[in-house]
C-alpha cells in the first residue's frame, strides 16, 4: 500500500514540498560551483565536503545536506531544551552556572576553547541532562544504573559528573564529549559522533548567552518529555523569560 498511499498523506506531501524548496536553493549553487573557475577558491562548507565524498559517483547532495542539517541542528537544539527543562526544575544551578561563567570570563578576558573547557560545572550539568533525557529511540537502562551513577540515579544532580571526574584516573572519562559502554548518547568506538566536540562548544556558548542575558521560569505545568522512551520536548510547555543585565560584557 505504501507506494500508493504516501502520495496522499498530508505530512509526507508537506515534507516533499520542503525538499523541493531545498532543491531550488541548493542545486543552482551546486551548478555554479561545478563550473570551472580557476580563480575561485573552493568554499570550506558542507556542500564542498559532500561533493568531495561523492568523488564523481551518483549521490544526492541535497538529501545529504538535509540529513546533516537534521543531525546538526535538531539534536543540539533538543539537548539545549532538555537542559533548560532541568535547570528550571532545579533553579539553584542557574545561579551556580552564572557564577562559573563570570569567573572564567574574568580570568581569561575572552571566550575561547580553553575557557569553554574550564566550564566544568556546565559540562557536568549538560552530561547529566543528556543522561536523563535520552535522544535515541531505544531506552537504555544502564544510563540510570545505580551501580554506575549512584542510588539517586533517577534524579538530576548537576554535580554528579563533576564528582566522578575527581576520581583518580577518571578525569577525562566523564567529560561531556567522552564515550564509553556505560554512556552511549554519542555512540562509541568507530561510530562515535564526530561532531560532538563542536556541539559541546556550541551548546556551552548558547547556554552562556541564555544564562547571563535572561531570567527563566515555568508558567504552567513542569516541563517534561512527550514520551517516556526518549526525550521529545512537549510543545505545550511554556517557559517565560525576561531580559536581565549581564554581569560581564562579551
Question: What is the meaning of each model-derived region?
Answer:
Residues 113-116, 188-196:
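Active-site rim elements
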Residues 144-173:
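Conserved cytochrome P450 K-helix/beta-meander segment immediately N-terminal to the heme-binding cysteine loop
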Residues 178-179, 190, 196-234:
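Cytochrome P450 heme-binding "Cys pocket" and the immediately downstream C-terminal segment
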